[in-house]
Curated annotation (Swiss-Prot):
Chain's gene name: polC
Annotated region (Disordered), positions in chain: 1409-1440
Family matches, as Pfam families: Intein_splicing, PolC_DP2_cat, PolC_DP2_central, PolC_DP2_N
Keywords: Autocatalytic cleavage, DNA replication, DNA-binding, DNA-directed DNA polymerase, Exonuclease, Hydrolase, Multifunctional enzyme, Nuclease, Nucleotidyltransferase, Protein splicing, Transferase
Name recorded for this polypeptide: DNA polymerase II large subunit
GO biological process: DNA catabolic process; DNA-templated DNA replication; intein-mediated protein splicing
Xref: NCBIfam families: intein_Nterm, polC, PRK04023.1, PRK14714.1, PRK14715.1
Highest taxon above the source species: Archaea
Species of provenance: Pyrococcus abyssi (strain GE5 / Orsay)
Function: Possesses two activities: a DNA synthesis (polymerase) and an exonucleolytic activity that degrades single-stranded DNA in the 3'- to 5'-direction. Has a template-primer preference which is characteristic of a replicative DNA polymerase.
Length: 1455
């Protein structure tokens, strides 16, 4: 694939900058001051390297490069087949092995090393015999279900390659019997009907033609449990559907026949003339018409049907209600402080507007920034929404070319607020938000989520298409919207329409901003016969016809109307009507969305809205009368000359998810250097403080010994003689030390004790000595604090050089656990930008390779729109300020620590433009190199959708069982069930994340160092869209597990555990199986579960992987979790494997990562030299990124056919060919450039910078403001919101906190050691510090006041009120009994909701104000009265001793 010169230069420039950074990092690393002498982040290889690593054979990459350069990709693939079969890459043993290797390698070359086609798609390659014919040998390709993911072209090519391999091996062709042919005919049809609709459903004749002529057998394994009637066909091993084979034949060979013919010609393969004839015949012939014949029963039924007179829109609404029900799933949980913006599908919520702005699509909604302001800025740029449809979540970005809210002001006036500045001006005067405004949602999101298309609301981009269509049909003038048109055509059209040509030109070029005046819009409708312009169309169908009829009569009888005239067209200019006369019809005007003012007791409708109201009503010349089964617009269109389309059919609900994020990544607590200081640094882990106080720290740390002078210490370079030291390995039993060279000779085993050596030991260090030396080395003395870590969590326990920490402290930056410095940000997609938006001059952009705007005009102005290159990113100014500090740190590091020239020399953040970063996302396998091209004043990271999609995610299928402990009880549950045990779901960076457990849940992991099974906290659980395929690993004893192709898998190799990507794992690799015995129903708990030993090394075993299969994913989602510390989990039948990767979305400067990242620092790399976890992709290939982005639409406007099809409630997949998507360009140079958008915006950073949620303090204030917004939005029931906040957030929190108090751990204030039970002497056995509770009373009842406010002020269910009051009683009774001396006497408060409940039910309140006397108001029973009588003395129990506080208890003990 040849790219245009500009794009090729772009990638070459990126590679040059990458190579430059690597050269500098290599020079620095070569000095020996770091754990490794080389850079530890490898670059991803080119296509040839990918092919070799994916499918082999070894050594083929070099030859592929040579052949591709000489012959091109297609011929090179065949040449490689020749060389493999000739044995140039080694003896493969059998002809079948040669055939399999040749097919996989050739296909990998043709698909440029994409994983799915050569590995997962082809299950097997066999040489079989035509036993039913002449017993000759032929080649059979066995396809698996995941071949679907490789695309039709790759499927078809695999058949072509198979035929070439067959010829090279001298095999005969496949000679199918009639049984074989009819079996495939049945399978294709059955698959289409019973499993899933094929993109191309070939006729039986087409299937027979292909089967008779394809020279190899297309077969495969059973993929679906659907039996066929053509059973026991010779040579076919299954009687079930072979999904892979069906897809290859139908969607591969037959659907892609035309494309395949081009490859046949290019590669010179003979014997496929039949396919050329098939293509020619198909192009000449008439398309087949299905379903023309009608049965007698159907025709009779048709005759007996009763014709019901029903309006078009009325019937559409009925069909809409029947087929697409509102979905309240997103609104079932409402978090305190995060508003619900619209109830499900409620009119007045977000109005659906199909399209993709230059900063939306790809699970991102565009909304008018005025909407953000008028919802009290709870929505800001980058805020995440939980949505009703098409997906579950979206990020918000600003779009100014769509409609904003329609609001009612406190004086009764109604106003359209499409402008950001107007929103700021009127925000304090808004009483009600009648209509929330538009949400631009991409067609691609509907395709991705397979959501039925909702009827499109009438909008400017639809109207302009009808406008140009009418011009063409009536006047035969061809014009195009959203582009420059020929002057001649413009002149001709403007003559016909009698309008200014310049206005027509501008309106066609930008119809979203340039709107005709109302009188001209009416003129267009009359002349061209098109509906009234949507800007002047009111929400007629939001109002009942009877209400419009009443309004019509009032206007006819009482309104004062000022009329005007335009070219013989009469239109209203002003309407004045008394508010008293109007009465409740004032609400009708409001619901119509008609702007008007209220002044001096009159309702005044000014220009142009007077015409917008009266023109559809025929200027009151015909009588509007309500009609059964007719919507308002149906009645108007039946009577009026000027027709209307509905602008308000489809509404979508949403609530606020997670607020936007853009801040530096800090460990908790923040760390400046990965150096252990133990208890010597105090609770702040301050190394400088420990040094000043002359303390000695005792920590687990790796030491190194100088082979020359014998110096021992944590430094990698000897401070005395400058020699690179050797790591000292230590025997944990006898404490003998062995330098690396000696330990290697002993196979890292102590020769005395026969125990595995460790690379670290518990040693004493003197911080003062080490810090003074480091300060001298880098000449940094004035830092206030130097924050280290309590202890190293890595398996090597190698510390960072203290010099790095000093330089970080000097520049005020913080390190992450792997040695890098990161900045987190919410992902937001962008495909086009204006130079002024990102603060970059045109001259600078030209230097970066941006020479033209997106329309191909030379770049000369800061207001031109430019298409973003795929690996360029636009960071927030917050990120810019922080990365500037990081750049200064890196320069200091190079200069003061490594003695190399400074690299960035940045004084202001604009100096970072053009420099490279690495982008990482949650649960990903690789970083992607990006280039900074600008900064915006918004808390998001804008980047190309390809860039965001390149950060892949890895997980397990939902039915994977995992070993966990729930409320103290060990049990196995599925990952899907685990996900449901967490709450507070948010959508971030393309995955769903939940962090808040509903119960006390921990996961079991294996400490690979000790072999013990240990309990680990769960940081979060995730749910991600599933890939089309998974890898299934089957072990020698029958156990198995499945995972995504790129997921890390723990395997045992060369005496140690290492991590491999799933696709790298080979048959014969060994995995750990823990042979622990688990009593799932046991309810007993142990004193300290952290030391629980459910399994040990001698009871565990290593099992070989016997079989690896690529299988089709059965679910739409995959799941995983982040387990703290050990980062592995026990799944299915006790198989131990790695969890998902756990990094949050972040960027880091490339050179910082290359200099400072080390696998030796990573906590999950326990024991052994493992593969580096971070690989960077240097050249982005859209074919290899997350397939979600392949559905992104890339057109300038949606065609008229699309809007009309939405009225039929079609599946988006039926319109896949109508709107161009990224998928349509894959494999072509155009996949990188020429992408278009439908909606422009004035500024990608226009809108609130920070959500109000982040600015407010306590929960009560957040909830109050949340409910104020709910009250204001017509589409929201605030009482329902209050109920949901209580039931989904506050009550579970109150009850959960109450439960956690009784199960809490105890903590040492000094060293932070935690205890399940407190030591008897009340002091920490580790450091002698004070022991305190980890859950306080304040933490338990922090939401109680908020909850009581809600049940007092809002109409919630009585049951909910009582739950709150009972919870308050439980809290009070707990603390009365535990800490009686701290309880104050409760005074009866008549305003308290709970005490009022008691009084209402009993007529009295007990002294504590609790609900103990709550009854149903009936008289006491005799039994109850007896129960209240005082007991006899003998029955009385002795009084309980006074309960004392822990504080008092501990102080007494210590005296």
């Amino acid at each position: 694939m040849e790219l245009p010169k500009e794009m090729e230069e772009y990638f070459e420039m990126l590679q040059r900058e990458i190579d430059k950074a690597y050269e500098i990092a290599k020079k620095a690393r070569a000095q020996g001051k770091d754990p490794s002498l080389d850079v530890e982040i490898p670059q991803a290889t080119d296509m040839a390297g990918r092919v070799e690593s994916l499918v082999g054979p070894p050594g083929v990459a070099k030859r592929i490069r040579e052949l591709v350069k000489e012959y091109g990709k297609e011929i090179a693939a065949l040449k490689i087949v020749d060389e493999i079969i000739e044995g140039k890459f080694g003896d493969l043993g059998s002809r079948e092995k040669y055939a399999e290797q040749a097919v996989r390698t050739a296909l990998a070359i043709l698909t440029e090393g994409i994983v799915s086609a050569p590995i997962e798609g082809i299950a097997n390659v066999k040489i079989k015999r035509n036993t039913w014919a002449d017993n000759s040998e032929y080649l059979a390709l066995y396809y698996a279900g995941p071949i679907r993911s490789s695309g039709g072209t790759a499927q078809a090519l695999s058949v072509l390659v198979g035929d070439y391999v067959r010829r090279k091996l001298g095999l005969d062709r496949f000679k199918p019997s009639e049984k074989h042919i009819e079996r495939m005919v049945e399978e294709v049809d059955l698959y289409h009907r019973a499993v899933t609709r094929l993109q191309y459903h070939p006729s039986p004749e087409e299937v027979r033609l292909a089967m008779r002529n394809i020279p190899i057998e297309i077969t495969g394994e059973a993929t679906d449990d659907v039996e066929v009637s053509h059973r026991d066909v010779p040579g076919v091993e299954t009687n079930q559907l072979r999904g892979g084979a069906i897809l290859v034949l139908a969607e591969g060979v037959l659907q892609k026949a035309k494309k395949l013919v081009k490859y046949i010609d290019k590669m010179g393969i003979e014997g496929w003339e039949w396919l050329k004839e098939f293509v020619e015949a198909k192009e000449k012939g008439e398309p087949k018409e299905e379903g023309k014949e009608e049965s007698l029963a159907e025709s009779t039924l048709e005759e007996t049907k009763v014709e019901v007179d029903m309006g078009f829109y009325y019937s559409l609404y009925q069909k809409f209600k029947e087929e697409i029900a509102p979905s309240d799933k997103y609104a079932k949980e409402v978090i305190g402080g995060r508003p619900l913006f619209s109830d499900p599908s409620k009119p007045g919520g977000f109005r659906l507007r199909y399209g993709r702005s230059r900063a939306s699509g790809f699970a991102t909604w565009g909304i008018n920034p005025a909407t953000m302001i008028l919802v009290d800025e709870f929505l800001a740029i980058g805020t995440q929404l939980k949505t009703e449809r098409p997906g579950k979540g979206a990020v918000v970005t600003p779009v100014t070319t769509i409609e904003g809210p329609i609001v009612k002001l406190k004086d009764g006036s109604v106003l359209r607020v499409d402008d950001y500045n107007l929103a700021l001006k009127v925000r304090e005067d808004v009483e009600e938000i009648l209509y929330l405004g538009d949400a631009v949602i991409a067609f691609g999101d509907f395709v991705e989520n397979n959501q039925t298309l909702l009827p499109a609301n009438y909008c400017e981009e639809w109207w302009i298409l009808e406008f140009v269509k009418a011009l063409k049909e009536i006047y035969e003038v061809h014009l195009e919207p959203f582009t420059e048109n020929e002057e001649e055509s413009i002149e001709e059209a403007s003559d016909y329409l009698e309008i200014d040509p310049e206005f027509l030109k501008e309106m066609l070029r930008d119809p979203l901003r340039v709107k005709p005046p109302v009188e001209l819009a009416i003129h267009f409708s009359e002349v061209l016969g098109i509906p009234l312009h949507p800007y002047y169309t009111l929400y007629w169908n939001s109002v009942e016809p009877k209400d419009v009829e009443k309004l019509w009569r009032l206007l006819k009888n009482y309104a004062e109307i000022e009329w005007s005239n335009f070219r013989g067209i009469k239109f209203a200019k002003k309407i004045v009507i008394s508010q008293e006369k109007l009465g409740d019809s004032k609400r009708t005007l409001e619901l119509l969305g008609l702007p008007h003012t209220v002044r001096d007791g009159n309702v005044i409708v000014d220009y142009p809205w007077a015409a917008a109201l009266l023109t559809p009503l025929g200027n009151l010349n015909w009588e509007f009368m309500a009609k059964p089964l007719y919507a308002t617009i149906d009645i108007i269109n039946e009577n009026n000359e000027i027709k209307l389309r509905d602008r308000g059919i489809s509404w979508i609900g949403a609530r606020m998810g997670r607020p936007e994020k853009a801040k530096e990544r800090k460990m908790k607590p923040p760390v400046q250097v990965l150096f252990p200081i133990g208890l010597a640094g105090g609770s702040s882990r301050d190394i400088k403080k420990a040094a000043e106080e002359g303390k000695v720290a005792e920590v687990e740390i790796a030491f190194f010994k100088c082979p020359k002078c014998g110096h021992v210490g944590p430094e990698h370079l000897c401070p005395n003689c400058g020699t690179r030291k050797e790591l000292l390995w230590v025997c944990p039993r006898c404490n003998a030390e062995y330098p690396e060279s000696q330990a290697e000779g002993y196979n890292y085993t102590c020769p005395k004790c026969n125990v595995k050596l460790r690379p670290y030991a518990k040693r004493k260090i003197r911080p003062s000595e080490l810090l003074n030396r480091a300060m001298e080395n880098v000449k940094v003395y004035g830092v206030d604090k130097l924050k280290g870590v309590m202890g190293m969590t890595s398996g090597w326990k190698m510390p960072e050089p203290l010099e790095k920490g000093l330089l970080r402290a000097k520049n005020d930056v913080y390190v992450f656990k792997d040695g890098t410095i990161r900045f987190d940000a919410t992902d937001a997609p962008i495909t086009h930008f204006r130079p002024r938006e990102i603060g970059v001059s045109v001259e600078k952009l030209r230097e970066l390779g941006y020479t033209h705007d997106f329309e191909g005009k030379p770049l000369v102005s800061e207001d031109q729109i430019v298409e973003l290159k795929p690996q360029d990113i636009i960071l927030s100014k917050e990120a810019g300020r922080y990365l500037l500090k990081v750049a200064k740190f890196v320069d200091d590091l190079l200069e003061k620590f490594y003695g190399l020239p400074r690299f960035y020399n940045a004084e202001k953040m604009e100096d970072l433009i053009g420099h490279l970063v690495i982008g990482l996302a949650p649960h990903t396998s690789a970083g992607i190199v990006g280039r900074i091209i600008g900064f915006v004043d918004a808390l998001v990271g804008y980047a190309h959708p390809y860039f965001h999609a390149a950060k892949r995610r890895n997980c397990f299928p939902g039915d994977t069982r995992i070993l966990v402990q729930i409320d103290g009880v060990p049990q196995k549950i599925t990952l899907r069930e685990l996900y449901e045990l967490f709450e507070d779901e948010r959508y971030e960076n393309m995955v769903y994340v939940r962090k808040k457990p509903k119960r006390e849940i921990k996961v079991y992991s294996i400490d690979l160092e000790t072999g013990k099974v240990v309990l680990t906290d769960i940081e979060d659980v995730i749910k991600a869209p599933a890939t089309d395929h998974l890898i299934r690993f089957e072990l020698e004893d029958g156990r198995s597990f499945e995972t995504t192709v790129d997921h890390p898998v723990l395997v045992y190799e060369n005496g140690r555990f290492i991590e491999k990507r799933a696709f790298e794992v080979k048959e014969g690799d060994k995995v750990l199986v823990s042979e622990l015995e688990l009593v799932e129903q046991s309810s007993s708990s142990q004193d300290n579960p952290k030391n629980e030993n459910l399994g040990s090394p001698e009871h565990d075993q290593l099992l070989e992987i016997k079989n690896i299969k690529y299988v089709r994913a059965n679910d739409d989602f995959v799941f995983s979790l982040n387990a703290k510390k050990y980062h592995n989990v026990i799944i299915n039948e006790n198989i131990v494997t790695h969890q998902c990767d756990g990094d949050e979305d972040a960027v880091m400067l490339l050179l910082d990562a290359l200099l400072n990242f080390s696998r030796y620092y990573l906590p999950e790399k326990r024991g052994g030299k493992m593969d580096a976890p971070l690989v960077i992709t240097t050249r982005l290939d859209p074919r290899e990124v997350d397939s979600e982005v392949h559905n992104m639409d890339i057109v300038r406007y949606y065609p008229l056919e699309f809007y009309e099809a939405t009225y039929e409630l079609k599946s988006p997949k039926e319109l896949v060919g109508v709107i161009e998507r990224v998928e349509d360009r894959l494999g072509k140079p155009e996949m990188y450039y020429g992408l278009k958008f439908t909606h422009d915006t004035d500024d990608i950073a226009l809108g609130p910078k920070m959500s109000l949620y982040k600015q407010l303090g306590d929960m009560e204030e957040k909830v109050r403001r949340q409910l104020e917004v709910a009250k204001r939005i017509r589409a929201v029931d605030e009482h329902g919101v209050a109920e949901k906040i209580l039931n989904s957030h506050l009550i579970p929190d109150l009850r959960g906190n109450l439960r956690s108090f009784t199960r809490q751990e105890f903590r040492c204030v000094k060293c932070n050691t935690k205890f399940r039970r407190p030591p008897l002497n009340g002091k920490c056995p580790v450091c002698g510090g004070k022991i305190v509770l980890t859950v306080s009373k304040g933490a338990i009842e922090k939401y109680l006041g908020t909850a009581k406010m809600l049940v007092t002020e809002y109409n919630v269910k009585n049951y909910t009120r009582q739950r709150i009051c009972l919870t308050e009683r439980d809290i009070d009774s707990l603390f009365e009994n535990v800490f009686p001396e701290t309880q104050l006497t409760l005074i009866v408060n008549p305003n308290d909701i709970c005490q009022r409940l008691v009084m209402a039910r009993t007529g009295e309140v007990n002294k504590s104000g609790l609900l103990e006397n709550l009854s149903n108001g009936s008289k006491k029973t005799e039994k109850a009265e007896k129960a209240e009588k005082p007991r006899k003395k003998s029955d009385e129990k002795p009084k309980k001793k006074r309960v004392i506080s822990l504080e008092e208890f501990f102080s007494r003990k210590s005296k």
